[in-house]
Amino acid sequence: MEWRYFVVIALICPLIIVETLAVSDCVRHVSESARNTVCDVRQYRVTKGVEADRYVQCFMTALGFADESGSIQRSNVLTALDAVETHDGVYTDAVDVCLSKAKKLPGTERSGSFFSCMLRTESAQNFRDAVELQELRVASKWPEGERFDRSKVQLMMRELNSQLRC
């Protein structure tokens, strides 16, 4: 009977670790040689390659925008966009187009494809805002009930990027 508890704990513990992953952890797990790639992604420069895909997958998962297999979590992305956009639903078409493109790719490339696609849409600024606000929320640096304030978010992100050497 005791071995069953061990199996359950062994299966649940990795899930708990994945859920508590922060974006800063994704940066720390990247090799020093890939630091410029990470910084390019954090500055919303479209960057391709294995290191970029790996980092984007990690931070999209940390934000709750993707699952571990690379599948985009549409409802989470839309909820984050709702938090920064006053015109409800303007960005839904962009999310759906990018989601459709990403679904056709292997799991390791989906998050990067979706991220890059969103940066090429009319909703690019809203997507950036949503990513940044969500990163601050996940890091417990933004009170959950506080309304979005672009200038405050941008200031906090500059400080965070500076700490991450980006």
Swiss-Prot record:
- Superkingdom, according to UniProt? Eukaryota
Lineage here is: Eukaryota, Metazoa, Ecdysozoa, Arthropoda, Hexapoda
**Which keywords does UniProt give here?**
Disulfide bond, Secreted, Signal
Q: What's a single GO MF annotation on this record?
A: odorant binding
Q: Where found, per UniProt?
A: Secreted
Full protein name:
Short form salivary protein D7R5
Which residues does UniProt assign to the signal peptide? Answer: 1-22
User: Disulphide bridges in this chain?
Assistant: 26-58, 39-166, 98-117
Q: What is its main location?
A: secreted
- InterPro entries for the chain: PBP/GOBP, PBP_GOBP_sf
Does this entry carry the keyword Signal?
A: yes
Family membership, please give it. Answer: Belongs to the PBP/GOBP family.
**What is the role of this chain?**
In contrast to the related D7 salivary proteins, does not bind biogenic amines such as serotonin, noradrenaline, histamine and adrenaline. It is hypothesized that either D7r5 evolved an as yet unknown function or is becoming a pseudogene.
Protein's UniProt keywords contain Manganese: no
GO biological process annotation, one example: sensory perception of smell
* Gene Ontology CC entries for this record: extracellular space
